[in-house]
Amino acid sequence: MKNKQFIILAVVCVVTLLPFMGLTDFHTKGEPREAIVAYSMIETGNWTLPVNNGGDIAYKPPLFHWCIAALSSIAGKVTEYTSRMPSALALIAMVLGGFLFYAKRRGASVALLMGLITLSNFEVHRAGMNCRVDMMLTAFIVLALYQLYRCCEKGVPWIATLFMGCATLTKGPVGILLPCMVTGVFLLIRGTSFFKAFFSMALVAITSCILPALWYIAAYQQGGDNFISLVM
């Protein structure tokens, strides 16, 4: 039953998202602003510190643009469809990840209902159909929270730190700060001492910085003080 409902949810996600992403042109200034960075990566070959259409350094970390550029390289060019694909895939991953999380704790029926409600939420669905970093950031944060909860039950949060590192590479330190703060409050509510909760989350946060630090170091080596000014 669980596998059947998982497949149903996956099919609904694919059918309601993937066929429609390229039907409209870019309709906000934010969409082409992200797509042009991926276009710049492909044209210049600079995937570390790309520039936007005006020649300025892109002010967001590059994971979202890497995904667009990779998909567009396969397709042959940057299009509305390839530019929106990372957001759609992030939404699908978030919904299916949520299904697996809730199916284990509340049953497959509740998990399926959760997935359908999430997918049909207007703002979530809109973000999953746009070429913006927000859906990918949200997906990584939500998946990190699922893993942190799982690690509160048992285990070490290695996967959570990977998700938070990817979230930071999508839109900056909020990808680490937000899930750590939420989990810290959760631990306090559960009766964990303040210092234990604080140092546990501090260790998780520091570990999560390793992956994005690799890009920040490479970007600084290439951009120097201009990159520091942009980040600060």
Give, region by region, the residue ranges found by the protein language model:
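Membrane-integral, polyisoprenol-dependent glycosyltransferases
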Residues: 1-232
